[in-house]
Amino acid sequence: MGYDETLYLKILRDTWGYSDFRGIQRDIIRSIAEGKDTLGLMPTGGGKSLTFQVPALAMEGVCIVITPLIALMKDQVENLRRRQVLAAAIYSGMSRQEIVKTLENCVLGNTKILYVSPERIGSELFQTKLAHIKVSFITIDEAHCISQWGYDFRPSYLHIADIRRLKPDAPILALTATATKDVIDDIQEQLEFKERNVFRMSFERKNLAYVVRTSDNKQQQLVHILNSINGSAIVYVRSRKLTKEICEFLLNNNISATYYHAGLEHTTKDERQRKWHDDEVRVMVATNAFGMGIDKPDVRVVIHITCPDSIEAYFQEAGRAGRDGKKAYAVLLYDKSDKAKLLKRIAQEFPNKEEICRVYEHIAYYLQIAAGSGYGRTFHFEVEKFSLLFHHYPVIVNSALKILSRAGYIEYDIDPDSRTRVKFTLERDQLYMLHETTPNEELVITTLLREYSGLFVDYHFIELAFIAHATGLTQQQVYLILTSLSQRRILHFIPERSVPLLTYTQDRVLPEEIVISESVYEERKTQFEKRIKSIIDYAQNDTVCRSRQLLRYFGETETNDCHQCDVCLTHQDTSQSYKDAYNQALKTIKALLADGEKHSITELNKIVLNQEAKDEAMEYLVNEEVIKVELNNIFLKK
């Protein structure tokens, strides 16, 4: 239908209350409205979501939004529904019945925006239903995940090309907050853009001051920073173990804190995230599992205790500070050992191919998979247990699993959504005839039957916290009751487990038959080495404005100094000190020569400490014909 400025502004005003678009929002919206494949590069807080939500309401059909961020899906669907927008989501953890119902609503035209996780789009059910859905356009959020050259490549994103073939007339809108030139080109190639079409918003964050602090005592520096800057904060660390240690350290120093990592139970993660978001807790200590899709605009400081593996990762995580446009800080703590640790990560991320083949062979022994079999089989796989049994380093095993996944031998899902599930094993009539249940057990059973449908037919995901609230019991009591009912075969209770899943995507081969191509190993290793070098250069730089250095990495060369990073402020201090020294040198030279006699430069050197300032002052006085220099002597010019 093309772009109608009046219509699109009316939707923006009536639904979101904004009077006009900002930045490159209008350009992106016009492009997608005209049916063009479009790549939008917008920094964190740049208003990405409106670039697909507004045209989704204006165009006929359903806008499909592919994103890996389940928390973001749920949050945006809830916000859109509050605005009377027909929105829905499909993600891992939903029952087949729920997915079918959601897709049927799309077929019937009862949905305008459908959020889908990349893992779901490859399913037969989704693709079958998609054929009957009128699609307006397809949005790919976090589009850098589709690029083999991106810092956060996700194999599941490669399924997106399947939708392109099923819906060839639906334009693609790809959005990302971090992309180098290689990644920009690769995104458009992977998504089969009909024509190159990129809109770039400057990644400059004028309210964000970038700081690197070199310190031998990072924990002491951390406390100093948090005591100096008020407001909400995120502290990023590299390991799950460190999240707890740093959190306890902050609590011992009277700083409100909690911690977050992928290994925590979903209910625990949700509760800690809520407390931090609602300012019940000030500091979130986390691994990089935290932050994507978290919409908290008033974070005043993001602190990295350990260096990320790339500028892209650092820029995205640091960018979570100051999304409200007010002054905020991004601080990287660096010490003498960090460079060696970063370089060591290269060998950890890319173990030699012989080691990778050994890990593959030992996995087969561990899971008891014979050569020539295993295709399609899925197993719970705990890296720590496996590593201990076969004498491997866990970090090497994790890297080998990623490389074997890229090479096509396995799929490895490190954080599957294995939430708590329940299914009744007794028929409904048998359930009503039970006589050996306690009042609390009857209360839990009644609540399950009232709040969840289809429990006699299939497993259903449940929330222990919700049942506890509905029954007036504690979560621990609900857990023990469900365990007891399961042991007595009244129902089947599967507690939440955050155990990674390993799937054989082809039959097991012998180690000598494994082929790991250059594109999977050598080329990616070279890219990783470049990213490591870039983050080291950033941390060790003390001459170039940090904002300029970051923007230059993303291809923005025509930028100015920020005048607020530690490098700029140091230069300003140095500049003022030099200016003072120069003025003092002028006064000293004039005072020395006031007697009208010749004086030696050696004599002058003894009383002017800053030699650079002295030389510049002498040059100025000579050019102004105030003094004259002959050999080693200076005197006033008559």
Which residues are covered by each model-predicted region?
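General beta-strand recognition
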Residues: 209, 635-636
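C-terminal accessory region of SF2 helicases/translocases
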Residues: 281, 299, 307-316, 322-635
